[in-house]
Structures are given as C-alpha cells and as structure tokens.
Amino acid sequence: MLLSELSHPNQLHGLTVSQLEEIACQIRERHLEVVSTSGGHLGPGLGVVELTLALYQTLDLDFDKVVWDVGHQAYPHKLITGRFNEFDSLRQQKGIAGYLKRSESHFDHFGAGHASTSISAALGMAIARDRKGEDHKCVAVIGDGALTGGMALEAINHAGHLPNTPLVVVLNDNDMSISPPVGALSTYLNRVRLSPPLQFLSDSVQESVKNIPLIGKDIPEELKNIKGSVRRLAVPKVGAVFEELGFTYMGPIDGHDISNLINTFNAAHRLKKPVMVHVVTTKGKGYPYAEADQVGYHAQSSFDLTTGKSIPSSKPKPVSYSKIFGQTLLKICEQDSKVIGITAAMATGTGLDLLQKNIPEQYIDVGIAEQHAVTLAAGMSCDGLKPVVAIYSTFLQRAFDQLIHDVGIQNLPVSFVLDRAGIVGADGPTHQGQYDISYMRAIPNFVLMAPKDEAELQRMLITSINYKGPTALRIPRGSGLGVAVMDEGWEPLKIGEGEILEEGDDVLIIAYGSMVQSATETANLLKNRGISACIINARFVRPLDQDLIIPLVRKLKKVVTMEEGTLVGGFGSAIVEMLNDNDINIPVLRIGIPDVLVDHASPDQSKEKLGLTPDQMAEKIINKFNLAKLNSKITVE
C-alpha cells in the first residue's frame, strides 16, 4: 500500500510489519520533502514514525482517542489521517496547521501547542468515557522533555489514584534523559514484563487463594504486598517510580521496532488500568543531519536536503532581537557575576545559548517548567542575585499566578525578557505572543517596556537589571531594524519616560515597541496626503509618561495608539484609561490585534489580514478623524 492511498488510519489494520516499514519510509520522504521546502518541525516527527504506525494499528480511530503532547511530532499522524494531499500547505496561510487542531480533523482529538497537557486531557476523556458507559481506548503520547512539566506530573499523580480507569500513556523518550534504552538487563526485563503468564500470574493466584476455606480472606492482602515487592525488584529504576505512582510500567521499548511496538501496545490495551509504555526513539531518525544535531534540527526553515544546510535568504537580514539580547546579556554577565540567565528549555530560541556556552555557571535551564522558573528567580532575587528570565510571551502565560503571588506582590527585582512578543507567524494561535501586555499590566509593581529598535533593547535590558523591582521587556520575533548596537556603556532609561520622534499638528500617534517603526511609515504616508502626525515612542506601558502624553493630547485632540498585541486590555486601553482618569474626553483610535485568534500564516500576511500594514493604518486614521484626503496615491517615501 502507498502512503498516498491512506485516507483513514484504520486502513493500517491487517498490514504486515514489512508493509508498515515501507509506509514508514514513505512518511519520512514526504516529511523531509515538505519541511525542507517550507520549514517546520523536523526532528520530532521523524522520530515517531514507527511509533505512530504501530500504535494506530492497535486502535480503532473511529472510536479510540489519541492525544499528542505539544504536536511537534504529529506530522506522521497528519499524513495517515487524510491530509497527505494537503501536506504541501503545512503552516501556510489557509493550509494545514503545524500542530493538532480540532477544527481541522476529527482525528485531532485535542489541540495543543504548549507542552505537558496530553495526560490531563486524555485522562479527562477517559473519565468521561467511563461516566457514559463507553469502552473506547484513550492514549496520551508525551515526550520526556514535556514530562518535566509540572502539569504532566500532576496528571500522572491523579491517574495513578484511579486504578480502574483504563489509560495508556506512551512516553516518547528521544533523548535518553530518563533511562538507558539498551542493555541485556533492560531487554530481558521488558520481555518478562510483556509475558502474559507473568503479567497476570499474581492476579490469578490471588483469585485462587481467595477460594481456600477459612484462610482465603486473609492471604490476598499479604500476597498483594509480595507482588508489589517483586515488581519493585523486577522493574528498572524509572519504572519503579511510575509503579509507585499507580501505573503499570512497560519498557523501555525500541521505538523503531514495529513488531515489538505492536505487541507492547496490544498488551497495554488489555490491562484495564493506567499503563505507562516507555518507548525510546531517535529524534530525527532516518535523516543523518537531524540525528547528529537534534537541537538544531528540532525545527528548521527551508534547507537543502542533500547538504542539510539552511537555504540563505536572497536578501541579508539584520541580526535578530533574540541574538542582540543574548549578546548583550553575556557582556553584562561578564561584568557582574550576580546576573543569572534563566530559561525554560528554550536556550537557543531566546539567545541564552551564548551564555550557556561561555559562562555556564551564570546560566540555568529549568526544563519545561515555567512556573518553577519564575519562583526560582524570585527566590534568587531575595538573596541578592539578579535573575533574568528569558521566556516566550506565550509560555509565560503558564506562570501567571507566580508572576502575581511570588514576584509582583513581593516587589522582587526579577527581570523578564518576553521573546516572540506579538505576531509570530506559522506556528499559529497557540504561539502568538499577543496577550502579554494585557495580562501583565494588571500586576502590581511591574514595570513594562518594549524597545523601538535594537539599541533601545540594550538600554532597556540594563535598565531592567538595575531596577529595584520587577520588570518585563517584550521583544518581537525575527530580525531587528539594522540599527547599530554598542558593546558596552549602555545608558539606562528613566523609568516611565517616552520620547517624541516626530513633531506634527494634525494627529497624535502613540506607538509601543515594534509598532514604532510602523507608526513612522504610516506618518510618511499621511504626510503624502497633507496630514502632519506627531509620533511618540511610548517605551513604557506601565507606567505611562503622562507628563509627555497628556499635554499633546490636549493640544491635538486626535489620538491613535498602535500596538502589536490584543486590543482587549492592551496598550491602547491603558491610554484610554489614563485619559478618562484625567477627565479628557476626545476620540481615540486604537490599532492592534482585535479580539480574534490569529491563525498560522507569515507575519506579513497576518498583519495584512488584521489591518496592521502602514497603508491600512493610514486609511483608518483618515477615516476615523475625517481628515482631508488628497487624490495622490499612498506610497512610502
């Protein structure tokens, strides 16, 4: 059978192992073909091809449910659930998503883009199944990295206390970070664990003993204790942990041995209780470059399949904001040993890999544990250290209570750098950094800031580290503007002080962060129409520069706010609240992301759809305030 002929995963039923292995090869070919052209997550999906095929051969996916953690590794799932012909559109506007999405396919049983959610969701489905008297299977597939998340451990703790709730958790261990996957002892123990006579022997003996007159009622409890002791001796160390938490442990299993996987999954399904199947896979399996560099090939932009090298852009781009941040923080750490960089499993993405490489003693990676990262930093700051927590905007949402309870209320000097703030592009709604302005500006004591360019980023970083309270600095994804940066001598900013970038008499534009450049371009378009705009770089949303803004508002009486964040409770709302508190009642046009989910597309495509391009914003301003229009076409000077 050809992969292209698969429209339903149940078509895998009855196929031989050799046929499944052939389909596995086709999945990898298609996976590599598309990701090398359009970009996407590469290594995770390549590592779970056999796991996916074997698991799905043991399930009836018209009824059974599988929850994939994060979704990085779900490309093979998409290819065998009717999306082969659409796979070319992966992560493109109006194409299929890079993650699981319930609205995209009824086989996507639970949407995800953040880690550690799968076991909770699958357990919830299992409980609902049992309440309704149904009998389908519920499976969660989670990676060893995601298992470091507290939510996953909370779910395991809960599931282990529901011994009569059938649930299979597949632990996809692709980093050997939990236990060694090879060795005669592991192979032997796994073979013993999967042996039906041993698996059910103690249960059978226990049932027989119950029927012995007089003594039958007393022995089972002792037998139960003996059975538990034998299990603790027989199971590898990591397995014992799961057994103590109430799971039956199976593994570790070779995640690329389809025959063994099928036997293991069938054995797991027969047990009507929580089961942990530990599967060891190789991230990037089948593509040597991805196997050799599992971090670098976790996700890739377009690349040459033959050489494995990224295809360079036809037009050189400036250095990214993330890299400028990483370079600057490294220089600060070289001068101050109290400054500590903290990340939650995103060293390369946030730019902290430079610190990790050069001054590892001033670098901490807590794993996928955002809540812990925040409170860890809070504790460090109590005793004189200067923690800088670099984290994606979308992931910091997971630690909202810690931001309030452990940092804000105690007014602790912790610096947060929110990477990927604003529109992020092809990763879609689970990864858009559109909410941080709203959810952070309500927290007491926090200072919130965003730079207009790379040089201002450096000044804001040193400002944050020197400030005696909590700060949050948001930076956008991607390249900077090409503004020159400094190697040292960064001048701190005065907290809450904005700046006038351009004088004007007709309308006041107050822009925040990445939208300052867009405001300048918009003002140029308005100038072509005979409209003079005054531009303020707000720099801060908490506190706002009232001394600068209010006099200009009273003078111009027409106000526009611009932000790359949600309008609900965002920067524009902060300006309106400030004006209301000062009894200023004038029209305000708030420009930003409306109350919608921003789907996957390129950032430029998303901005156009949201009305955030300079020409669209110029038209909005003209229409809102009935400003005089000239007949000349709007063009950028």
Curated annotation (Swiss-Prot):
Enzyme class (EC, first level): transferase
Protein name: 1-deoxy-D-xylulose-5-phosphate synthase
SMART domains: Transket_pyr
Protein source organism: Prochlorococcus marinus subsp. pastoris (strain CCMP1986 / NIES-2087 / MED4)
EC number in record: 2.2.1.7
Keywords, comma-separated and alphabetical: Isoprene biosynthesis, Magnesium, Metal-binding, Thiamine biosynthesis, Thiamine pyrophosphate, Transferase
InterPro entries according to UniProt: Dxylulose-5-P_synthase, THDP-binding, Transketo_C/PFOR_II, Transketolase-like_Pyr-bd, Transketolase_BS, Transketolase_C, Transketolase_CS
The keyword Oxidoreductase belongs to this UniProt entry's keyword annotation: no
Cofactor notes: Binds 1 Mg(2+) ion per subunit.
